[in-house]
Amino acid sequence: MKCPFCGHSNTQVLDTRMSEDGDAVRRRRRCEACDRRFTTYERIELFFPAIVKKNGSRVDYARAKLKDSMRLALRKRPVSAEAIDEAITRIEEKLLALGEKEIPSSQVGELVMRELRKLDKIAYIRFASVYRSFEDVSEFSDVLAEVTAGSGKR
């Protein structure tokens, strides 16, 4: 591996360990030329399916975009950043498990709605109202009835 300080191509691995979450190998290295030390990480490269939008265009999957849309729905709701990240990870695991090269954005939207429903009913309704493009109050009422019936409250 090339030294980031002097560019020399010979480095020595001093220590190799698994990261805490087990998804990376951490290596401590020393440059044989300048004697400086640095750390490298080796991770699995995951390939998410391309997202096919309603207009037929294709975009790369972007975790940040998914996180932004979920955070918007969860704004001012009592849900931790950690819980949001865990939900996004579950969505990503489902996307990878599909084994497809492309998936429609509607499928991602449905996965997001399922996770939001588990996290916070209000956020679920907020997201559903935008995602499903509610045209009138009756559509809103239908989703409210569905959520309250599912939680045993009326």
Curated annotation (Swiss-Prot):
* Key words of the record: ATP-binding, DNA-binding, Metal-binding, Nucleotide-binding, Repressor, Transcription, Transcription regulation, Zinc, Zinc-finger
Could you tell me the superkingdom of the organism this chain comes from? Bacteria
Positions of the ATP-cone domain: 49-139
Give GO MF terms, alphabetically. Answer: ATP binding; DNA binding; zinc ion binding
Q: Where are the zinc fingers (unnamed)?
A: 3-34
The cofactor(s) it depends on are: Zn(2+)
Function recorded in the entry? Negatively regulates transcription of bacterial ribonucleotide reductase nrd genes and operons by binding to NrdR-boxes.
- What family does the entry list? Belongs to the NrdR family.
Q: What is this protein called?
A: Transcriptional repressor NrdR
